[in-house]
Amino acid sequence: MSAVEAPSASQAIWPELTEDHPLSQLNSRLPTILSEAGHSQIWGVTLTYSTPPTFSSLIILQKFLRSVDNNVDEAATALGKTLKWRKDWGLDARADKKEKENFGPDFEGLGYVTKIKKNDGGDEIVTWNVYGAVKDLKSTFGDLDRFLRWRVNLMEEAIAHLHLATTSTPIPDFNAGIDPHRMAQVHLYEGVSFLRMDPHVKAASKATIELMAANYPELLSRKFFVGVPLIMSWMFQAVRMFVSAETAKKFVVISYKENLANELGELEGVPKEYGGKGLSLGELQNQLRGEDAVTSS
């Protein structure tokens, strides 16, 4: 099979694929997968079957393959389920119309998306979950469907900043290199030791872990747990039960929030309260949104 050109000005080329390559095999199943799912959109990419495959479709297929160690059958099943889930949740319909769901004051200040420059010089998107900003446990976590929609909305915004539909950088094969199209997550637990016994929080945490593992493969580079009290150790045991050993290796636990910046990246991209020299999370998020608005205009 010939090399694949990206639909970009740089005319990037995906490494040549043989007919028996896992990507070629998964691509050949796309017609069936798309037909059965009744949906073809994911993370800003419209999956299409062609020979050779489109560059953006390969980005998506490669993520699903890497998540299951190149098992084509498992990747095809997982992709089909995710596409059906996205259709049921109406995620891409809202994205097409550029509609944003309003979750109300119960979720204000709980989640942010920013960009940092890593210690190795590359840019990285970061999602922030500020659990200390929860005003009322039942109001925020009691309606599980609403909480999950909020969490998915935060994830979808972060993924949009990865620009998977227009990237010109391919993803290496499984065990052949690092996927450059991933993000970091920061979970801030300062002041939330009281969450341990709340059943709404436990249910929301468990459901979120399962949903993310099933529908957002290979999007996590690093996951920071900051200011975690010992009483909440149950959460980390729960997380490790629902993710792969490879994913668990990405977890970093930081006791003191001021130490986060040194682990995360360039100080200017991290708020001062977390050891950086940057603006507040809200200001950094608005800055990123402004940059993307200029780029896409």
From Swiss-Prot:
Gene Ontology BP annotations: Golgi to plasma membrane protein transport; regulation of exocytosis
Domain of life of the source: Eukaryota
Catalytic reactions on record: a 1,2-diacyl-sn-glycero-3-phospho-(1D-myo-inositol)(in) = a 1,2-diacyl-sn-glycero-3-phospho-(1D-myo-inositol)(out)
Every CRAL-TRIO domain range: 106-282
Gene Ontology cellular-component terms listed: cortical endoplasmic reticulum; cytosol; endoplasmic reticulum membrane; plasma membrane
Subcellular location: Cytoplasm; Endoplasmic reticulum membrane; Microsome membrane
Protein purpose: Non-classical phosphatidylinositol (PtdIns) transfer protein (PITP), which exhibits PtdIns-binding/transfer activity in the absence of detectable PtdCho-binding/transfer activity. Regulates PtdIns(4,5)P2 homeostasis at the plasma membrane. Heme-binding protein that may play a role in organic oxidant-induced stress responses.
Family in the record: Belongs to the SFH5 family.
Name of this chain's protein: Phosphatidylinositol transfer protein SFH5
